[in-house]
Amino acid sequence: MTGSAADTHRCPHPKITKGTRSRSSHARPVSLATSGGSEEEDKDGGVLFHVNKSGFPIDSHTWERMWLHVAKVHPRGGEMVGAIRNAAFLAKPSIPQVPNYRLSMTIPDWLQAIQNYMKTLQYNHTGTQFFEIRKMRPLSGLMETAKEMTRESLPIKCLEAVILGIYLTNGQPSIERFPISFKTYFSGNYFHHVVLGIYCNGYYGSLGMSRRAELMDKPLTFRTLSDLVFDFEDSYKKYLHTVKKVKIGLYVPHEPHSFQPIEWKQLVLNVSKMLRADIRKELEKYARDMRMKILKPASAHSPTQVRSRGKSLSPRRRQASPPRRLGRRDKSPALTEKKVADLGTLNEVGYQIRI
């Protein structure tokens, strides 16, 4: 998960000293001024975390802000920070080798190799997300960020793991990838988490990173998408989290140079207000439509359409009218009315003319 109030006093990630590779000449004071950069801050579960927007090498402001946060949340605080930053010698951090696919490998073995690589990078407990992920950025740009992850070999969080998983599974057309997002509630706070759903040869699984082993990767053993989602929901219950919403995106194309952004939430289910039978029904309809490649990104410049509850989008049930692109579908009890896109700026081939 991207944040947890119960985990704010965990020991920082042992790879925290990796920052010295990028900026070895940083000053080492423990007492620092606060950031105040609200555009580089976010909250999840009531816990503040920062995002490195300076790239690499990390600039001094981001570097000092990270250490200040660690000093606040670590049980030993400034003592631990000072011991690391003022040490005369620090062991050189290991750089894991990026996995390479071999023809002798099965798909489950390949996915396990990717997940093991992510685990070697380890989960980022520093309170600073090292790689900025803008969800609406084109896929080609996000793949460049994934390359940077392999070069820097720094700890990552769940959103970074999704992008890295897409990058490492590119070129395997038998593997379909799509994001699965969760919004949960615990102890008065809301939490957000995302994993990379996997579909291959009739089975579902996932790749990802989390503080909790049960909330990241899942093997390719689930016959249906609903079985996979329910397994995550059951895992959340072990930590007393109530799943409020589940968002499913579209398949991510195996085209690393695509300018199309990832569709993160084509289907939105307000699961806390639905029966499991209804959740399963909606998920299986959606999974069938994804497999048949009927669904289209809501970001396309064309009229949008919301599927009504219980209505299929399979070819045998579609009307004879010309096909229309589908918009994001929200399965909450109250559906807000979608506005039809303005076609005044579209030319004859469907491209929008920017003025």
UniProtKB/Swiss-Prot annotation:
Q: Which Pfam families match?
A: Vasohibin
Look at the named UniProt entry and state the broad enzyme category this protein falls under: hydrolase
Single GO molecular function: actin binding
Here the segments flagged for biased composition (Basic residues) are 11-26, 308-319
Tell me where the transmembrane regions lie: none
Q: Which compartments does it reside in?
A: Cytoplasm; Secreted; Cytoplasm, Cytoskeleton
The record's account of tissue expression is: Preferentially expressed in bone marrow-derived mononuclear cells at the sprouting front.
- According to its UniProt record, the EC number is 3.4.17.17
Q: Which UniProt keywords apply?
A: Carboxypeptidase, Cytoplasm, Cytoskeleton, Hydrolase, Phosphoprotein, Protease, Secreted
* Covalent S-S links between cysteines: none
Q: Which reaction does it catalyse?
A: C-terminal L-alpha-aminoacyl-L-glutamyl-L-glutamyl-L-tyrosyl-[tubulin] + H2O = C-terminal L-alpha-aminoacyl-L-glutamyl-L-glutamyl-[tubulin] + L-tyrosine
Result for mutant: residue 193 to A: Strongly reduced tyrosine carboxypeptidase activity
Q: What is its main location?
A: cytoplasm
Q: What is the effect of changing residue 211 to E?
A: Strongly reduced tyrosine carboxypeptidase activity
Q: Where is this region: Disordered?
A: 1-45, 297-335
Which family, according to the similarity comment? Belongs to the transglutaminase-like superfamily. Vasohibin family.
Binding partners and assembly: Interacts with SVBP; interaction enhances VASH2 tyrosine carboxypeptidase activity.
Say what the protein does.
Tyrosine carboxypeptidase that removes the C-terminal tyrosine residue of alpha-tubulin, thereby regulating microtubule dynamics and function. Acts as an activator of angiogenesis: expressed in infiltrating mononuclear cells in the sprouting front to promote angiogenesis. Plays a role in axon formation.
Q: What is this protein called?
A: Tubulinyl-Tyr carboxypeptidase 2
Taxonomic classification: Eukaryota, Metazoa, Chordata, Craniata, Vertebrata
The gene that this protein is the product of is Vash2
